[in-house]
């Protein structure tokens, strides 16, 4: 379970003279920084459910060309199991391999700078959910400090309004 994994990580950090926070900063220094955020758009009632279906259909048939000024270079549709990637100016389709051919009503968009936006309707509530993974450029290998964490977090959060506007939210 997740608690066992975090205990293993904490033990590793302690054995190496670090706190969990120190270890997280080391991970950012090695792999770069990324901020995740979720936006929920609630649409109650029967008309809300219809709006959510229409939104998903629109995103599926009219994929954004850019998000927050960044060109979309790859899309994944886990309902149709089709991935489209922009290669040399042409969109190339290929199948998404899923265990047992399972599908899900999820769409993902990837930009040229590594931003990822995922969208799916909630299975239990009258809402559509948007998940954003926002990378922030760092100098790989350079020590990453608490001040770097604060700066990168603020930079990523500052991009959220433009991302939302690009998706019509």
Regions inferred by a protein language model and the residue ranges of each:
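Short, well-ordered beta-strand elements
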Residues: 117-119, 128-134
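A generic beta-sheet turn/junction motif
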Residues: 123-125
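Phosphate-binding and adjacent anionic-ligand microenvironments
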Residues: 1-120, 138-143, 149-169
């Amino acid at each position: 379970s997740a608690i066992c994994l975090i205990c293993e990580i904490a033990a590793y950090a302690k054995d190496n003279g670090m706190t969990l926070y120190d270890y997280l900063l080391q991970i950012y220094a090695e792999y770069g920084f990324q901020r995740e955020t979720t936006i929920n758009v609630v649409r109650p009632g029967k008309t809300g459910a219809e709006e959510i279906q229409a939104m998903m259909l629109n995103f599926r048939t009219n994929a954004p060309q850019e998000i927050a000024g960044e060109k979309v270079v790859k899309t994944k549709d886990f309902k149709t199991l089709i991935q489209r990637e922009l290669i040399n100016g042409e969109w190339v389709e290929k199948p998404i391999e899923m265990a047992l051919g399972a599908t899900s009503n999820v769409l993902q968009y990837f930009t040229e700078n590594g931003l990822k936006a995922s969208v799916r309707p909630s299975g239990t509530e009258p809402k559509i959910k948007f998940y954003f993974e926002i990378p922030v450029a760092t100098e790989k290998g350079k020590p990453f400090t608490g001040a770097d964490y604060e700066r990168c977090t603020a930079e990523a959060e500052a991009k959220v309004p433009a991302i939302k506007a690009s998706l019509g939210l």
